[in-house]
Amino acid sequence: MLDLKLIRQEPDFIKEKLATRGVDPADIDALLELDAKRRELIVKSETMKAQRNTVSDEISQLKRNKEDADDKIKEMRQVSADIKDIDAQLDTLKDQVQDAAAHLPNIPNDNVPVGLTEDGSVELRQWGEKPNMDFTPKAHYEIGEDLGILDFEAGAKVSGSRYLYYLGAGARLERAVYNFFLDENTKAGFKEVLPPYIVNDDSMYGTGQFPKFKEDVYQLKDEAMTLIPTAEVPLVNYYRDEVIPEEELPVWFTALTPAFRSEAGSAGRDTRGLIRLHQFNKVEMVKFCKPENSWAELEALTKHAESLLQKLGLAYHVITLTTSDMSFTAAMTHDLEVWFPEQQTYREISSCSNTTDFQARRAHIQYRDENGKLQYVHALNGSGLAVGRAVAAILENYQNADGSVTIPDVLVPYMGGLTKITK
């Protein structure tokens, strides 16, 4: 949520910055018009309430003097009726202002590349050697099916498209990957959390999924409850409507959860394999910190996510997304994209974002500074990492000509000493 006071004071700045994210300046004008009407009615309501108090005092005085107060009583009833009408209008306007503001994305940082598409993202760095194979690499889903460790056909039979079964060494590899991620995250100072997988609408609003992105998630019928699209939702909302003691900042959380996504608008994209599923495991990282530290925290978050890929020996690059390609809540996003030999391209495996005070305003998460003044924290989030995509990257990058897959060294202890998956 943007600061409404800032929008009032610097409308041209807001229009210019949000235009780079595809926001029509007319939307800002419409919000300001609603806000002006609301503020005007607030003044009118307060004036009439003061008038009602004055008339009430006059009625009391007339009654004490045993004088006729009928006219004043009629006047007060009319004023009270007018106040009730104005307050009803105010309630409506408040909701309209809130809704209009809730649809505006975060202000992009000045260092974010401007672009209305993903084209224009800036590569920051590359790491690792892409595997040099003397055979034609297979896609991860072909490898998994040939080894009997991934069963997409059974997933489609039981649940539909974009679901699967992990079997045998495949299930163990998935478990090895997320346990490795969690162990590395906790070693780095993150507190492990096991959160709820179903959250209420206030939580979805707090992290910015609602009201704009309801079509992207699975909601429970006849209940204001949603299956989480990411652990970011329950982790950020842990502190919703709370004041974090200053001495506890920064707070670092990590969690493994399933993520449930409808993938609305993704028809025809990545229809095979582990890249785009309706249900997948993801290890998430969330940080809360003071505003002055959030950009350093973003770099540290990104570097830590990179370290996971480095320990797995997977080649990747880091890019800064354009203004329109980064998430709705982000002021800046660094994507980590891992190399897929069969596709001969990089694919996203982590997004690390600084949401500044955007989520904190929506979720009312504050801390009290050294002067005793309440301030909004800055919240950051990043995948650490997407588990299924990591499994896919391992299958493709560690495949052998005979169809087997070598286990990365760091995962061998998690695989019970298994060094290779074979038929």
Curated annotation (Swiss-Prot):
Keyword Aminoacyl-tRNA synthetase appears in the UniProt entry: yes
Coarse class of the protein's main subcellular location: cytoplasm
GO cellular component, one term: cytoplasm
Known pathway: Aminoacyl-tRNA biosynthesis; selenocysteinyl-tRNA(Sec) biosynthesis; L-seryl-tRNA(Sec) from L-serine and tRNA(Sec): step 1/1
GO biological process, alphabetically ordered: selenocysteine biosynthetic process; seryl-tRNA aminoacylation
Sites where the protein binds ATP: 261-263, 348-351
Listed CDD domains: SerRS_core
Entry keyword Aminoacyl-tRNA synthetase: yes
Keywords: Aminoacyl-tRNA synthetase, ATP-binding, Cytoplasm, Ligase, Nucleotide-binding, Protein biosynthesis
Cited InterPro entries: aa-tRNA-synt_IIb, aa-tRNA-synth_II, aa-tRNA-synth_II/BPL/LPL, Ser-tRNA-ligase_type_1, Ser-tRNA-synth_1_N, SerRS_1_N_sf, SerRS_core, tRNA-bd_arm
Class in the EC hierarchy, top level: ligase
Enzyme Commission number: 6.1.1.11
Record's subunit section: Homodimer. The tRNA molecule binds across the dimer.
Function according to Swiss-Prot or TrEMBL: Catalyzes the attachment of serine to tRNA(Ser). Is also able to aminoacylate tRNA(Sec) with serine, to form the misacylated tRNA L-seryl-tRNA(Sec), which will be further converted into selenocysteinyl-tRNA(Sec).
Listed PANTHER family: SERINE--TRNA LIGASE, SERYL-TRNA SYNTHETASE
Protein name: Serine--tRNA ligase
Encoding gene per record: serS
